[in-house]
């Protein structure tokens, strides 16, 4: 996994906020669409194969009532017409079954492998100035990264609502409070903290390592059940 952080005044911030939502919607479309198409194509093929009329009539919707219904239902469900024609041609060639891939919403499924953004944690970097604009229903300027010029102005609450909806719909983006984080910065003279590791436990300067550590707390349990505070404090200082 990786962490991707974009500033709230970035000119592409709206597309970034909606990125994961759109990709999740693609998965929903793939899963639902594949099931609908598969069901209707099989129904069309079945109407051709199980026809009891003259052989030539079995593949003509105007002469095969069951096929006519199946084709009509498929068109109502928005199944592409070329697929409808193709499966009828398939039946003419003597085939009695058809394979059409059906996708599911499993995290490791092919549907998710076809969309982007699945290997990153996305967060938006917000400042106190932006939050104040949200609170007062003010406008917010998006600025070019190199020129600093305003590329778009919009209501701060509109942007905030986009963040809220996207987080509800797809669990991304997260929020990083830039002003607060840097108010607590222990090395402020070295520059701003602008991002974190993927889970946001560790925040520090650009291009510095994220060396996470853990302690087995059971090792600090004394024989009488008390917690060994002295040794625990010593261990934490080592990190």
Language model regions located:
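Active-site cavity-forming subdomains of large catalytic enzyme subunits
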Residues: 1-234
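Long, compositionally biased non-active-site segments enriched in small/hydrophobic residues and glycine
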Residues: 235-239
């Amino acid at each position: 996994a990786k962490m991707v952080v974009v500033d709230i005044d970035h000119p592409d911030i709206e597309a970034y906020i909606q990125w994961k939502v759109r990709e999740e919607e693609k998965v929903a479309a793939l899963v639902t669409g594949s099931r609908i198409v598969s069901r209707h194509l099989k129904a069309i093929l079945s109407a051709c194969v199980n026809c009891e009329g003259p052989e030539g009539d079995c593949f003509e919707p105007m002469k095969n009532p069951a096929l006519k219904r199946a084709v009509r239902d498929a068109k109502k469900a928005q199944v592409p017409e070329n697929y409808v024609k193709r499966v009828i041609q398939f039946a003419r060639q003597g085939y009695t079954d058809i394979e059409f891939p059906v996708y599911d919403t499993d995290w490791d499924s092919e549907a998710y492998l076809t969309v982007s953004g699945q290997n990153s944690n996305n967060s938006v970097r917000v400042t106190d100035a932006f939050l104040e604009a949200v609170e007062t229903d003010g406008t917010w300027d998006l600025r070019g990264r190199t020129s600093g010029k305003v590329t778009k102005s919009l209501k701060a609450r509109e942007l905030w609502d986009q963040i809220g909806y996207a987080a509800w719909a797809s669990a991304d983006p997260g929020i990083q409070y830039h002003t607060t984080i840097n108010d607590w910065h222990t090395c402020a003279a070295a520059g701003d903290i602008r991002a974190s590791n993927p889970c946001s436990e560790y925040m520090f300067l650009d291009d510095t390592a994220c060396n996470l550590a853990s302690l087995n707390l059971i090792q600090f349990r004394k024989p009488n059940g008390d917690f060994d505070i002295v040794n625990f404090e010593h261990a934490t200082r080592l990190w």
